Amino acid sequence: MSRPAEAAAIRPGVSRAVRSRAQLKQLLDDLYVRYSRRDLLSTSALSVPHRYPRREDREIAGFIVASLAYGNVKQIHRSAESALEAMGPSPARFVRHFLPARDAGRFRHFVHRFNTGIDLALLCYLLHQALERRGSLQAFFLEGYDPAHEDIGAALISFVQRALSLDVSPFYPSGTLPAKAGVRFFFPSPAEGSACKRLNLFLRWMVRRGDGIDFGIWTEVSPAKLILPLDTHVARIVRRLGLTKRNQANWRMATEVTRRLRAFDPDDPVKYDFALCRLGILKEPIPD
C-alpha cells in the first residue's frame, strides 16, 4: 500500500478570485468567526485529547492522535480511540512506565492504514525515553527551539533527529532503525521537504491559546512561530483563496502560506487552520 504523500501534487481547481489584501483578511476573519467554535470540535481529531483534564495526558494523547491524523476522519477517530483505550485511563502514566517486553503486546491487533501495532509500541517507547530524559515533550522539544528563529522549522528538524536517535533495540536488536521502519512516518522532517502536517498539527494543539479550541499548554513556544498544518486538502483550499500559487503541498508551500497569514495576524497566524479544515471536512463551498 502506498503512503499518502504530504508533498503530493494538487489537482488544478477553479481559478482563484483576485482579492485585495483587505478583502482576503476580511474573508479569513469571517471564516474564523464562523467555524472556530467548540461545538465543532466533534468534527476534529482534537476532540479525543480534549477528553483528558490533565495537561500531561493531553500532551501524550495529543501526540498519539496527531500522529494518526491521516486518512478519513472516521478512520482517524476509530484508530485514536483504539490506541488510547489500550493505554488505559492515563496516557502519560502509561508512557512514563512503558516497558517494551510487558506493554508492546497491548497493540498487537492495532492497525491504522499502513502503521501497525509495532509502530505504535515503538512510538510509545520513544516518547517514554523523551519523558525520562526531559520530563515532558515540551521540554524535549525546547532543546532545539530558538525563539529568535522566524519559525519552528529548525526546532522541528532537531526534534525529529533527536527522537529518531533514541534507543530502538527492544524492537530492532541491531540498534539501528531501518530506513523503511513504519515509526519514521510519525517523524517527517522539514529537512526532507515534508510539509510535516501532523507534527505542525500537534504543535498547534499544544501552543495556541485563547479561543478554547487548542490547549495552549506549551507556554514557552510562541504561537507566532507556528507553521500551518498543510495537507493536500488544505493546500487546495488555500490555492483557491489565493494564498499561494504553488502546486506541491510541501514545506515551502506551508511556510509561504504561513507568511501570508502572518501578515493578517502576526501573533497567531495559524488561528485560521481549524476554520480552513472545516471547509473541507464539512464539505462547505470554498469562497471564490
Feature names for model-found ranges:
Residues 2-288:
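HhH-family (HhH-GPD) DNA N-glycosylase catalytic core used in base-excision repair
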